[in-house]
From Swiss-Prot:
Glucosylceramidase that catalyzes, within the lysosomal compartment, the hydrolysis of glucosylceramides/GlcCers (such as beta-D-glucosyl-(1<->1')-N-acylsphing-4-enine) into free ceramides (such as N-acylsphing-4-enine) and glucose. Plays a central role in the degradation of complex lipids and the turnover of cellular membranes. Through the production of ceramides, participates in the PKC-activated salvage pathway of ceramide formation. Catalyzes the glucosylation of cholesterol, through a transglucosylation reaction where glucose is transferred from GlcCer to cholesterol. Glycans are attached at residues 58, 98, 185, 309, 501. The active site is at residues 274, 379. This is Lysosomal acid glucosylceramidase. The gene is GBA1. The keyword Heme does not apply. It catalyses: a beta-D-glucosyl-(1<->1')-N-acylsphing-4-enine + H2O = an N-acylsphing-4-enine + D-glucose; a beta-D-galactosyl-(1<->1')-N-acylsphing-4-enine + H2O = an N-acylsphing-4-enine + D-galactose; cholesteryl 3-beta-D-glucoside + H2O = cholesterol + D-glucose; a beta-D-glucosyl-(1<->1')-N-acylsphing-4-enine + cholesterol = cholesteryl 3-beta-D-glucoside + an N-acylsphing-4-enine. Its EC number is 3.2.1.45, 2.4.1.-, 3.2.1.-, 3.2.1.46. Belongs to the glycosyl hydrolase 30 family. Gene3D superfamilies: Glycosidases. Pathway: Steroid metabolism; cholesterol metabolism; Sphingolipid metabolism.
Length: 536
């Protein structure tokens, strides 16, 4: 649901404490101890008539954040984004020794430890690379810094399609010569060598954190497929263990070899992007069908051993890479087979049918059955459903969909969350089947400009503040409430709490940390906050 567009006056200006606090008398009372910080570079807001604003960036200017630092012991930092136009604005406050608030109490339970986080990121598709490289070099650099640098939101995961997908401008694989079972003609095209690989290297150079690469194939070469086409209903010819399956498994190793020659190593591969898609007649773009039994046997007999016996034996293998609706069934089929299970490190999930599949019955049940197999959210975007507008520049609701999904996933044992295209054009492409969708960054090459959407900042409320190795801990509410909340601890023991308010009501609240005291604050309607403090 969209809401009325904010006026220019609602958008952020470099303003004093009085202006910032004037929006809420309750906020003024609760946060009187808070001093507002003015560092970094503010958002230049622009409204396109949707519920909030985008931040405008070009070759000479882009909003930015200061590198992450924790406040002194006894104080806390609060980063705030709101529908009315604030974007990760920093304030600091004093942790109180006594509880004076009367509203909601959130109590940190650090002794309750859950999963350790892998991280957050997005996909370097052909479309994303084309859009980024269509900007002038200075604008390209500011876009990449926004995502990957410590002045940005600190992404540490990049998903890389293995050859073409729908977000390509042509269909291709790395081995299109028919019946080349030895893959003698395997080669990376310019989409990899001129577009994706150089940009990935630039991202890695800008990042202060280690960045993990994740690869996923959409289709095999057509000569390995039952239908002889990149799209539509089709799977690998033959049976697991035969020449078709062995060749397809070796294709993964060839891909990893080729990227290694370009000095890029992968953290993980998924066995197939959306394997259920290739079981559907008339599926419009690149796919390769697997039933759970077929994927189990392909992993056990072909892909698992081939990776394990290669120089890439440290690369993790993730199964599924499809809708969580398919859980826990797919996990039961694959992971109860010891020959397949020994090669599987994790289960990747997509978000598109989450509205049909409650997290507890899918993610929760799968974790209960297979607690040692990690869950990882590998793809999400808005605007893909037939009833949705592809791009809604400045949609706050779409940002809230992202942060609500991330919090829900974290609460159900997921270790990372990956967006889809890093950047798209105002149409939501390019996409060779016109399957246009939205993206946290939209590039307008006619103006050498890019727009950072609310989705970008909602993601940043997690990615910047929750580094790899952070661990989710308990957080208990004193009463039923409309907030989405999650708590984590950094590897050094510092605390992070994210609070999302998807309602229109301001919610006074107190965060209690038994080790240090009480954080008195407020969650305004349609806002997201990240709180940080030292515990020792």
């Amino acid at each position: 649901m969209e809401f009325s567009s904010p006026s220019r006056e609602e958008c952020p200006k470099p303003s004093g404490r009085v202006n910032i606090m004037a929006g809420s008398l309750t906020g003024l009372l609760l946060l009187q101890a808070v001093s507002w910080a003015s560092g970094a570079r503010p958002c230049i807001p622009k409204s396109f008539g949707y519920s909030s604003v985008v931040c405008v960036c070009n070759a000479t200017y882009c909003d930015s954040l200061d590198p992450l630092t924790f406040p002194a012991l006894g104080t806390f930092s609060r980063y705030e984004s709101t529908r009315s136009g604030r974007r990760m604005e920093l304030s600091t406050g004093t942790i109180q020794a006594n509880h004076t608030g009367t509203g909601l109490l959130l109590t940190l339970q650090p002794e309750q430890k859950f999963q350790k986080v892998k991280g957050f990121g997005g996909a370097m598709t052909d479309a994303a690379a084309l859009n980024i490289l269509a900007l002038s070099p200075p604008a390209q650099n500011l876009l990449l810094k926004s995502y990957f640098s410590e002045e940005g939101i600190g992404y540490n995961i990049i998903r890389v399609p293995m050859a073409s997908c729908d977000f390509s401008i042509r269909t291709y694989t790395y081995a299109d010569t028919p019946d080349d079972f030895q893959l003698h003609n395997f080669s990376l095209p310019e989409e990899d060598t001129k577009l994706k690989i150089p940009l990935i290297h630039r991202a890695l150079q800008l990042a202060r954190r280690p960045v993990s690469l994740l690869a996923s194939p959409w289709t095999s070469p057509t000569w390995l497929k039952t239908n002889g086409a990149v799209n539509g209903k089709g799977s690998l010819k033959g049976q697991p263990g035969d020449i078709y399956h062995q060749t397809w498994a070796r294709y993964f190793v060839k891909f990893l070899d080729a990227y290694a020659e370009h000095k890029l190593q992968f953290w993980a591969v998924t066995a197939e992007n959306e394997p259920s898609a290739g079981l559907l007649s008339g599926y419009p773009f690149q796919c390769l069908g697997f039933t759970p039994e077929h994927q189990r046997d392909f992993i056990a007999r072909d892909l698992g051993p081939t990776l394990a016996n290669s120089t890439h034996h440290n690369v993790r293998l993730l199964m599924l890479d499809d809708q969580r609706l398919l859980l826990p069934h797919w996990a039961k089929v694959v992971l109860t087979d010891p020959e397949a299970a020994k090669y599987v490190h994790g289960i990747a999930v997509h978000w598109y049918l989450d509205f049909l599949a409650p997290a507890k019955a899918t993610l929760g049940e799968t974790h209960h059955l297979f607690p040692n197999t990690m869950l990882f959210a590998s793809e999400a975007c808005v605007g893909s459903k037939f009833w949705e507008q592809s791009v809604r520049l400045g949609s706050w609701d779409r940002g809230m969909q992202y942060s609500h999904s991330i919090i829900t996933n974290l609460l159900y044992h997921v270790v990372g969350w990956t967006d889809w295209n890093l950047a798209l054009n105002p149409e939501g492409g390019p996409n060779w089947v016109r399957n246009f969708v939205d993206s946290p960054i939209i590039v307008d090459i006619t103006k050498d400009t890019f727009y950072k959407q609310p989705m970008f900042y909602h993601l940043g409320h997690f990615s910047k503040f929750i580094p790899e190795g952070s661990q989710r801990v308990g957080l208990v509410a004193s009463q039923k409430n409309d907030l989405d909340t999650v708590a984590l601890m950094h590897p050094d023991g510092s605390a992070v709490v994210v609070v999302l308010n998807r309602s229109s009501k301001d919610v006074p609240l107190t965060i209690k940390d038994p080790a240090v005291g009480f954080l008195e604050t407020i969650s305004p309607g349609y806002s997201i906050h990240t709180y940080l403090w030292r515990r020792q």
